[in-house]
């Protein structure tokens, strides 16, 4: 490896110093321009090897790296992955909820319309749903969950793999009450129970049947 593209060079430098690793660090984060990524690609094409490191999680999973990997693929550059910590799978495993099928939704938008549309699209999703959330937005998000999804079971995973790791398992309404009396701290992974499965005949009412009576069926000779 010739250089390291880091989300925060200060954070990565502490890790490198801890293990006495001497490598050039360059900044590559969520606000980096396309020009920055193209510069990295250019250096790799010139014969150098690079690593991508993020501060607290797996690169590309709600962290920088996705665009860079895409550019590498388009340029025919081989990309190797070193499996690292992923809060998504860790939180799912410890949630106590269904782990066979799940959907990771990342951070919800702060735009009210986009946020509402996103949550509405998930209302009937039967898979376990996983979200990331910041502490100052937690109660608002829990209230939105109650509004759009009802009072489902939820696992609130805080500061996973860190000193103050905590996992709370309760219902959404219980979580709202808890955090109205306990100040949220740290980064959260929210694992929400999926919607109940409905039989395909559910909702096929007499009104539905009548609505089809005007249709003319084709005649087969």
Task: Tell where the protein language model's regions lie, with residue ranges.
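Short hydrophobic/aromatic-enriched beta-strand-loop microsegments
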Residues: 22-30, 79-80, 100-106, 151-157
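Single conserved hydrophobic/aromatic residue that forms the stacking wall/gate
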Residues: 214-221
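Class I SAM-dependent methyltransferase SAM-binding "motif I" and its flanking Rossmann-like core
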Residues: 67-125
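Generic beta-sheet signal
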Residues: 47-54, 102, 127-131, 188
């Amino acid at each position: 490896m010739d250089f390291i593209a880091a989300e925060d060079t200060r954070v990565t430098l502490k890790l490198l110093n801890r293990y006495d690793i001497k490598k050039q660090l360059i900044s590559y984060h969520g606000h980096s321009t396309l020009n920055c990524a193209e510069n990295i690609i250019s250096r790799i094409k010139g014969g150098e090897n690079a690593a991508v490191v993020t501060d607290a999680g797996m690169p590309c999973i709600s962290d920088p790296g996705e665009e860079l990997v895409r550019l590498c693929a388009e340029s025919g550059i081989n990309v190797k992955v070193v499996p690292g910590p992923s809060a998504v799978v860790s939180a799912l495993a410890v949630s106590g909820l269904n782990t066979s099928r799940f959907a990771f939704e990342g951070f919800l938008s702060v735009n009210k319309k986009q946020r509402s549309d996103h949550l509405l699209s998930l209302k009937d999703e039967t898979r376990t749903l996983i979200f990331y959330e910041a502490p100052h937005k937690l109660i608002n998000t829990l209230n939105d969950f109650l509004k759009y999804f009802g009072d489902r079971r939820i696992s609130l995973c805080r500061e996973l793999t860190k000193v103050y790791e905590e996992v709370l398992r309760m219902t959404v309404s219980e979580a709202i009450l808890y955090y109205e009396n306990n100040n949220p701290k740290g980064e959260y992974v929210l694992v929400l129970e999926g919607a109940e499965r409905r039989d395909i005949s559910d909702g096929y009412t007499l009104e539905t049947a009548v609505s089809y009576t005007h249709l003319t069926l084709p005649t087969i000779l």
